[in-house]
């Protein structure tokens, strides 16, 4: 696909469909993000062949000061568009947590262009020692989408039902002059798609189905040997794949 050369990361972990190799943009929701880092241009030396066109790294939320914070966001607009999000963040001593959920929908500006999405995210953290932190998080999203095709070449019954999930664990250290992370991640997806048909043609008698997965372990340690210098060493291992089939109706 055209987006296979752009690598999307969440907290440094790659996010793409394990069979097709492209990112699923709808799985990267704004409710996750504390900030977004962008590497422009080819970065394959550090990130692999998926980074030929650049890298987008989404850094997830966390509380930096003790307290409890709850945010509620809701918006409504044209074409019956609704977006909602609620987030609760806690920091109490060594413990931190972030829990957020969202619901979004729209009818679209054309017939058969509806979209609906549910999402949830949770992240827990604990400071083991002054320079050591442990984190675990999970992200789930499901969306239903319809595609009407182009105005000149419309498509009927083109529907998608897609579920994506992600979980990760990370052990981090930061001594100032040296820092590093040991992490594990596991991503999975379930796709059910009706490719649709042109007006006047018979509806398809099958639905495309797939299950995909991607998992990996990575470690790196960075050290500043002298002023203006930083040396980083690391290693990672990844496995991806899945299964695709047509289910006849």
Where are the predicted features?
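Short strand-turn segments of transmembrane beta-barrel domains in outer membranes
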Residues: 6, 43, 55, 60-90, ...
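Signature of Gram-negative outer-membrane beta-barrel scaffolds
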Residues: 226-249
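Flexible loop and strand-edge segments within Gram-negative outer membrane beta-barrel domains
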Residues: 106-117, 127, 131-214
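Short acidic/polar hinge/loop motifs at secondary-structure boundaries
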Residues: 13-40
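Transmembrane beta-barrel strands of outer-membrane/channel proteins
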Residues: 72-76, 99-103, 136-142, 182-188, ...
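Transmembrane beta-barrel architecture of outer-membrane proteins
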Residues: 23, 51-53, 81-83, 117-119, ...
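Outer-envelope beta-barrel architecture signal
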Residues: 6, 66-70, 82-84, 93-97, ...
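Residues on the lipid-exposed face of transmembrane beta-strands in outer-membrane beta-barrel proteins
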Residues: 86-90, 122-126, 169-173, 217-223
């Amino acid at each position: 696909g055209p987006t296979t050369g752009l690598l999307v990361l969440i907290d440094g972990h790659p996010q793409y469909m394990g069979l097709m190799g492209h990112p699923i943009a709808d799985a990267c929701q704004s409710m996750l993000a504390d900030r977004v880092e962008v590497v422009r241009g080819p970065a394959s030396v550090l990130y692999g062949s998926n980074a030929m066109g650049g890298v987008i790294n989404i850094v997830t939320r966390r509380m930096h000061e003790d307290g409890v914070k709850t945010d509620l966001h809701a918006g409504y607009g044209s074409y019956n568009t609704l977006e909602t999000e609620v987030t609760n963040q806690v920091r109490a001593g060594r413990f931190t947590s972030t829990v957020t959920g969202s619901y979004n929908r729209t009818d679209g500006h054309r017939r058969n262009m509806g979209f609906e999405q549910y999402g949830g995210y949770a992240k827990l953290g604990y400071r083991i020692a002054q320079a050591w932190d442990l984190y675990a998080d999970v992200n789930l999203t499901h969306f239903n989408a319809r595609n009407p095709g182009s105005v000149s070449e419309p498509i009927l019954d083109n529907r998608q039902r897609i579920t994506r999930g992600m979980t990760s664990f990370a052990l981090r250290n930061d001594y100032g002059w040296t820092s590093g992370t040991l992490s594990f991640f596991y991503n999975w997806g379930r796709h059910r798609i009706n490719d649709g048909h042109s007006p006047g043609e018979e509806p398809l008698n099958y639905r495309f189905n797939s299950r995909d997965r991607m998992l990996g372990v990575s470690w790196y340690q960075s050290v500043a040997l002298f002023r203006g210098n930083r040396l980083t060493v690391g290693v990672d291992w990844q496995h991806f794949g899945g299964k695709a089939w047509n289910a006849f109706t």
